[in-house]
């Protein structure tokens, strides 16, 4: 295989990875939109959070396809892993900080698990896209950021299992 053909395959692979991330982001955003009304019924702050997550994830889909820069990919990883960690905290420790249900532990549900799996998939796909066609220095930095995110999620999962 010539180096030109190999380069085209790698570029196509990265593009496919970005399409996976964009599709999962759209899915997670639509799932958040689906449950936004019930969260507004609980408290305006919960509803506003879900509306913000919806907007961010739906808008992220075209952004990551049009401008797949390192900062855009890293922002997607950090943002989605933050939502995953908040989700796991609300299912183990309780809703943090604000609102009438602060401190209450939420139940796991089918729709929210689907959204969380989508968000983890986004982080993995974006991490893979970061590692393709990168310099050794930026690859190390990207791996470190992805590793910190995954260790953080792993730690929260550990807390979930320990709490149940």
What is each residue range found by the language model?
Residues 24-39, 159:
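Membrane-embedded alpha-helical segments in integral membrane proteins
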Residues 70-74, 132-147:
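Membrane-interfacial entry segments at the cytosolic side of transmembrane helices
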Residues 153-164:
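Juxtamembrane boundary at the C-terminal end of a transmembrane helix
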